[in-house]
């Protein structure tokens, strides 16, 4: 069974989201996603400063098995990317919840209401 930390929020597209003290959201892919994909060999992340809508494909994760889009969980502006993750994408396999991919600042009027909690995500992947 996959690891699903209770303190995070999730999407049904297998991204995890952590709300930071300054209100930005840190986004990564879940343990279930990395396990399903297998050995990750490449990450393409969004550009800092890019405005995105919830559900937009903002990047790509490629593994030896498949390529999959990475989706924005909310509407907002990309404020940071984890360049270390693009340099060593295999680190996501070893620590899916420790290796974040990008940070996003919520757009005015945007919310996190559509994100799901750990219990709902656990049911989704069981």
From Swiss-Prot:
Q: Check the record and name the Pfam families matching this protein.
A: GCV_H
Keywords per UniProt: Lipoyl
Required co-factors = (R)-lipoate
| Gene Ontology CC terms | cytosol; glycine cleavage complex
Query: Which top-level group of life is the source organism from?
Result: Bacteria
Answer whether the UniProt record assigns the keyword RNA-binding to this protein. Answer: no
Q: Its quaternary structure?
A: The glycine cleavage system is composed of four proteins: P, T, L and H.
Q: What is this protein called?
A: Glycine cleavage system H protein
**Native species of this protein?**
Burkholderia cenocepacia (strain ATCC BAA-245 / DSM 16553 / LMG 16656 / NCTC 13227 / J2315 / CF5610) (Burkholderia cepacia (strain J2315))
Primary gene name: gcvH
């Amino acid at each position: 069974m996959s690891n699903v930390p209770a303190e995070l929020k999730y999407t049904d597209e297998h991204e995890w989201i952590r709300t930071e003290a300054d209100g930005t959201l840190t986004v990564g892919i879940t343990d279930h996603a990395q396990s399903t994909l297998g050995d990750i060999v490449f990450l393409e992340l969004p550009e800092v400063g890019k405005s995105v809508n919830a559900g937009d494909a903002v990047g790509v994760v490629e593994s030896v098995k498949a390529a999959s889009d990475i989706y924005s969980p909310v509407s907002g502006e990309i404020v940071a990317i984890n360049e270390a993750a693009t340099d060593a994408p295999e680190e996501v396999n070893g620590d899916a919840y420790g290796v974040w991919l990008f940070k996003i600042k919520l757009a005015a009027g945007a919310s996190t209401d559509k994100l799901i909690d750990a219990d709902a995500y656990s049911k989704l992947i069981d």
